[in-house]
Amino acid sequence: MPGRGLLLDPFPGSGPHGGAERPVRRGRIVDPESCGRLLGRIADAALGPDRSDSVIVLSHPVLAGAEHRTAARALLAALGTTRVLVLSSARAAAAYAGPRETGPLLVVDMGAELTEVTLLVGGLVADARQAESGLDDLDGLDPATFPTVLGRTVLDMITSMWRHDRHGAIRGALRKGPVLAGGGALRSDVTDHLARCLGTRVRLADDPSTTVVRGAGQILSSVLRHRPTPPERSGHPR
């Protein structure tokens, strides 16, 4: 949240009766009611009861379908906000951890339930791959083989994109160095393995696990700075 740091739901795993509440799985909203409660708690803490003249950024998996985006928009609209900005998690990660220079960029997001590789060209998604597996699926794996298994998933997706790339964008993005995000990028054995296999440097934010949310916040701050100043209201200020 601009000016207030990161604001997270303090009880994301607690339902109204003390049970587990996992409204989003594999990047999809599977329990809209629980998701609405979670968003409501965050909005209460961040915005208070009056959500007028407020802006929310919605970041979604890069290959999220129209049905998922529509469901998410509906939940956010129910909060009473004025405007919702929708962008992919890859664009958010690039905004925070990507280089300032233009050109093609690879974003590798290794999350708990999804692993994604995205090629951005001019800030727009040019190609993407998604594996419906993540860190949670590798629990219990031999630590010595963990980087190899996760790395193989990432490298297979990059190889697939390379084969379909007719303009050399993947090669240019690799020379620049991919942005690594998500919990998998917290592990130096994983990041070192990817750097060796790709033969290039990798780009990491201070806390890769929050790269996407920090990038979304950065974009939100930019939007708020450039939006028109509302006219002054008569009466007592609120």
Task: Give a label for each model feature.
Residues 106, 114-115:
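Internal active-site segments that recognize and position negatively charged phosphoryl groups
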Residues 111-113, 183:
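Gly/Ser-rich catalytic serine loop of serine hydrolases
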Residues 117-120:
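Amphipathic beta-strand/beta-sheet edge segments enriched in Tyr/Trp
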